[in-house]
Amino acid sequence: MNWTLGKAERKDSNRINELFIEMLQTIYNTKQVNGYSDGDLDRFFDGRDEWISIALDDDNIIAFLSIEVHHEDEEFIYLDDLSVTKQYRNNGIGTKLISNAEAYAQEIDIRTICFHVEKSNIAALRLYERLGYAIHEDQGSRYLMIKNI
């Protein structure tokens, strides 16, 4: 498999929404899910710190990871909505997207990365633990996971 990483543009919103729906259907084991609402992705394309990393096979988006930079009392990067389309899973794409986000965090001198993972998403939980993320807080149906880099 020959895929590359890139940065999403506004024109990629529909495909990103399709992958988001696919992710939700997998996690919740139902077809009855809603995608992003109109305008939900706009903040990732307005030139601020937030952006979406994508994996491409030729010109087809096969995966994405939303990256949010938070400048609060403690600065951190929040990783949101990682989705790899089914036929490309278990090929290191999710790992590469996360590694890309970690490199970005180091580039902008932010040392903490966190995200939420559904407890039922065992494959994702194993991946994150393998990459050095630890459960920081049990929040009912999901965990808050953190890694200091």
Residue ranges and their predicted role:
Residues D12, D81-S83, Q87-Y88, G92, ...:
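Conserved functional loop/turn residues at catalytic and ligand-binding sites
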Residues V84, N90-A103, R126-R130:
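Conserved acetyl-CoA-binding loop-helix of GNAT-fold acetyltransferases
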Residues T95, K119-E137, Y143:
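Conserved active-site alpha-helix within GNAT-family acetyltransferase domains
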Residues L144-I149:
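Terminal substrate-recognition subdomain of acyl/acetyltransferases
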Residues F64, E118-K119:
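Short amphipathic helical patch at the helix-1/turn junction of helix-turn-helix
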Residues I98, A105-H116:
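Conserved GNAT acetyl-CoA-binding A-motif
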Residues W3, K7-D80, T85, I98-S99, ...:
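Acetyl-CoA-dependent GNAT
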